């Protein structure tokens, strides 16, 4: 999209208030969605909750194929469809809602750097575990990913996705990593996040930003997703301030909000 087109879209978005029927789409929660997509969806839900913007979560078996980018989650707001956290943050900002406007330029650069760290380490580790760890692939991933579809389409789609992810892993230098090396990367990422958070309630003191939403989405999902073993979640559990951080956001933005609305609730 050209800069002129982007500016035009932003003007249109800004002119329309946030509707009550805004919808977020993801895969089927109980039997289909995988760790990485669940984390991405939860990050967007947390971000919108932090902005105090209502959103209804709708689960569709074909959500990945409905998305304009082929990735979930995506939101349908008025006549606009936007996918993934980064573009959604910009879309929401165009409507006058921002969590990071109070940061100075140095802080904004630091926030973006930590968001890159999460995407480069945690998200990539989740994808590796789902599609490159043979035990997880055999016991969880293929069955869940293909669950809405009849044989042989369920197997075809799962193998196609696995091939795509493995090709990506090779391209970024993760193709020959062992599971232990990936878990060490996760530990280093958690250590960096833990040190940055310190004793603060959020990464930039008292108010959450999109970084907090992103970190919460991934850490909470890692902590609450049953895998073939607990090695991944144990890495997060080593950092008590990250556990307290997840619980704080869960209580404030999901449990408290769910008392007045059934649209978002964590299991």
Swiss-Prot record:
Belongs to the metaxin family. GO terms for biological process: mitochondrial transport; protein transport. InterPro entries: Glutathione-S-Trfase_C_sf, Glutathione_S-Trfase, Metaxin_GST, Mito_Protein_Transport_Metaxin, Sam37/metaxin_N. This is Metaxin-2. Pfam families: GST_C_6 (PF17171), Tom37 (PF10568). Interacts with MTX1/metaxin-1. Associates with the mitochondrial contact site and cristae organizing system (MICOS) complex, composed of at least MICOS10/MIC10, CHCHD3/MIC19, CHCHD6/MIC25, APOOL/MIC27, IMMT/MIC60, APOO/MIC23/MIC26 and QIL1/MIC13. This complex was also known under the names MINOS or MitOS complex. The MICOS complex associates with mitochondrial outer membrane proteins SAMM50, MTX1 and MTX2 (together described as components of the mitochondrial outer membrane sorting assembly machinery (SAM) complex) and DNAJC11, mitochondrial inner membrane protein TMEM11 and with HSPA9. The modification N-acetylserine is found at residue 2. Its main location: mitochondrion. One of its GO terms (cellular component) is SAM complex. Involved in transport of proteins into the mitochondrion. It is found in: Mitochondrion outer membrane; Mitochondrion. The gene is MTX2. Keywords: Acetylation, Membrane, Mitochondrion, Mitochondrion outer membrane, Protein transport, Transport.
